[in-house]
Design a protein with these regions (language model features):
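A short SAM/SAH-binding and catalytic strip from SAM-dependent methyltransferases
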Residues: 115-128
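Class I SAM-dependent methyltransferase SAM/SAH-binding core
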Residues: 52-105
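A short glycine-rich, Lys/Arg-flanked "PGG" loop and its adjoining helix->strand segment in the class I
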Residues: 129-140
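A short acidic, Gly/Pro-enriched loop at the edge of an enzyme's catalytic core
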Residues: 104-115
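Core SAM-dependent methyltransferase catalytic element
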Residues: 188, 192-218
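Short alpha-helix
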Residues: 171-187
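Conserved beta-strand signature within the Rossmann-like core of class I S-adenosyl-L-methionine
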Residues: 142-148
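Conserved class I S-adenosyl-L-methionine
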Residues: 1-46, 60, 159-166
Length: 218
């Protein structure tokens, strides 16, 4: 299992860079067509504005936010992902609002955003430097919404196969109670919740910026 997880770590590193062109297709296939629904679940209810998406990928969520005329911006560490997201926005008649940057060093002033969003982030999400930057750039009582994973639960054959693959490759697992501790310690009040869709269950974390440095789990 460790060998498999090591291989997947290398694969995902290329998936976000040299293989970024294949991201949307692969995501749709492995999720059995549910990927967009999982990503968009982070917008219910509509977040306050202005909004920053951290690790925006190919820009699907930014495109939806722009379609809703939301005041939104995006950052991603991958040059390839930034290029793809910018092209997608412009192709659909929207201004490009993406910046290449790491979550650990956001190029924005203090309390710039009312909401931060991240869907299916990699390990950076629990880096104390990332959470410190999230706390710095969020307004008082602002929300950092995170969708860390989804579970495929449909009864169909392909859903069952995909669900099994998600489990054996570690793409889905029950989050331990301590998973959100680094987020709480960064100064957020954390609430975990499930979003039930027709063929899957999405795990969603709502982290509200606390005025003090030690948060708590709600």
């Amino acid at each position: 299992m460790r060998v498999l997880q090591g291989f997947l770590r290398i694969f995902f590193r290329h998936f976000y860079t040299s293989l970024a062109w294949s991201y949307d297709l692969v995501a749709s296939i492995v999720s059995v067509g549910q990927w967009d629904d999982w990503v968009l679940s982070i917008l219910d209810p509509a977040p306050a504005q202005p909004i920053l998406e951290i690790a925006h990928g190919t820009g699907n969520l930014l495109h939806e936010l722009a379609r809703r005329q939301a005041n939104s911006f995006g950052v991603d560490a991958s040059r390839q992902m930034c290029r793809m997201a910018s092209r997608k926005l412009k192709r659909n008649g929207h201004a490009s609002t993406v910046v290449q940057a790491k979550a650990q060093a956001l190029p924005f002033q203090q309390e710039s955003f009312a909401a931060l969003l991240s869907t299916f982030p990699t390990e950076f999400i629990l880096d104390p430097a990332s959470m410190a930057e999230a706390h710095r750039t969020l307004q008082a009582q602002g929300q950092y919404r995170i969708v860390p994973m989804a579970e495929i639960r449909g009864p169909g054959y392909f859903d069952r196969v995909a669900g099994w693959l998600f489990r054996v490759t570690g793409q889905y697992a029950e989050l331990p109670a301590t998973w959100s501790q680094p987020i709480s310690e960064a100064g957020f009040v954390v609430r975990m919740e499930d979003v039930n869709l027709s063929r899957s269950r999405v795990t969603r974390l709502i982290a509200t910026r606390s005025s003090r440095k030690e948060g708590q789990v709600a």
